[in-house]
A protein has these predicted regions:
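Acidic, two-metal ion nucleic-acid-processing modules in DNA metabolism proteins
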Residues: 1-82
Length: 82
């Protein structure tokens, strides 16, 4: 599947470490006045400090369908964060 790149996204303040060993990131990104979109980054826990700064980020990701408790949504599967 294609990998997308977006510059200038900011975490909405939702970012947290998840997983048994807290090595994954769950975040909600916004860009400008756009609606927030959920994201998950497996193995990217070490990059959490970048999200807490509130500065614009560059992200690489794929799109995926997320099904949780009967609800279906689109989320970003993060490949990298800078």
């Amino acid at each position: 599947s294609p990998v997308f790149y977006t510059d200038g996204v900011v975490d909405s303040g939702f970012a947290k470490l998840v997983g048994q060993d807290k090595s994954h990131i769950k975040a909600r990104f916004v860009q400008g006045a756009s609606s927030p979109i959920d994201a998950i980054g497996f193995g990217l826990g070490k990059k959490m400090n970048l999200l807490k700064k509130g500065t614009p980020l560059r992200i690489a990701y794929t799109l995926e369908e997320n099904v949780w408790q009967g609800n279906v949504s689109v989320q970003l599967r993060l490949k990298d964060i800078e």
